[in-house]
Structures are given as C-alpha cells and as structure tokens.
C-alpha cells in the first residue's frame, strides 16, 4: 500500500506547535479593514489554536 500524502492546502494553512496543538490564522483580516474597528483588526492579525472538534482531522491531513 502506498504512503499517505499530506494535503498541501492544509499544510499551508495550519502548523503544528511543539506541544502537538494545531495553530491557524484568523479569517476576515486581510481586506475591507476600514469597516472594522482597531480592536477587531488587531485581534484578527493574531493566530489562534484550533479547537478540538477538527483537530484530529487536520492532523491526519497534515501528517499524511
């Protein structure tokens, strides 16, 4: 049986931390920022940890 390939789109969007959690960037932070207040845009530029519901699925996609 051949090796599993990692999902290239998922590899570009998600990174694994040293503790094994999955880090992701927030959406809605790249354009149309004049409509959003400063607090919101500042928060949108920070990365966050993926919640547990999708973590197992994304790990399988990244590690292949």
From Swiss-Prot:
SUPFAM superfamilies for this protein: L35p-like
GO biological process assignments: translation
Pfam family, one: Ribosomal_L35p
Alphabetical list of PROSITE patterns matching this protein: RIBOSOMAL_L35
Gene3D superfamilies per UniProt: 4.10.410.60
Molecular function GO labels: structural constituent of ribosome
Domain of life of the native organism: Bacteria
Assigned protein family: Belongs to the bacterial ribosomal protein bL35 family.
Record protein name field: Large ribosomal subunit protein bL35
Species whose genome carries this gene: Chlorobium limicola (strain DSM 245 / NBRC 103803 / 6330)
Phylogenetic classification of the source organism: Bacteria, Pseudomonadati, Chlorobiota, Chlorobiia, Chlorobiales
Recorded name of the encoding gene: rpmI
């Amino acid at each position: 049986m051949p090796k599993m390939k990692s999902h290239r789109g998922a590899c570009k969007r998600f990174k694994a931390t040293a503790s094994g959690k999955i880090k992701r960037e927030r959406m809605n932070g790249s354009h149309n920022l004049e409509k959003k207040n400063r607090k919101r845009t500042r928060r949108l530029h920070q990365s966050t940890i993926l919640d547990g519901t999708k973590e197992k699925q994304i790990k399988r996609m990244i590690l292949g």
